[in-house]
Amino acid sequence: MKKAICSFIYYKLLGWKTKVSAPDYDKYIICAAPHTTNWDLFIGKLFMGAIGRETGFMMKKDWFFWPLGPIFRWMGGIPVDRSRKTSLVDQMIKIAKSSQKFHLAITPEGTRKANPNWKKGFYYIAQGAGLPIILAVSYTHLRAHETTLHL
């Protein structure tokens, strides 16, 4: 039912076209770019629902206030405190290794502003946990493309 609803909204109502070439692994990192708007989260979640996959995401902790916090957590959100220099990469590696399923979407720019210098956390998480990276590129005339990169 969820897949049908997400498919209807994503493909029919919003008019997106997709090309999915990545197998459905039990564990992976999605590197999604470019991140240009707050709508990216919802479009990405609709896309994943439409193809029958689930994924978590990391988001600035400032967004996890009432009533959005419980909703974002329910959607798979992980709050990130960017002001503290904690080893988020090490934490994500530990979670990935101890989980039977681990699907995490990361926007490598780290912000919605144009940033040609991507943050490398997604790569280090994938490398440390031995996960494939799925590259997801969007926003070319309502088209999304996905492919897999093995490290």
Predicted regions and their residues:
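Conserved Motif II region of HX4D acyltransferases
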Residues: 27-32, 90-129, 133, 143
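Glycine-rich, highly charged phosphate/nucleotide-binding loops
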Residues: 81-91
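Conserved small/polar residues in nucleotide/adenosyl-binding loops
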Residues: 140-147
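A short linear hydrophobic-aromatic micro-motif
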Residues: 17-19, 133-136
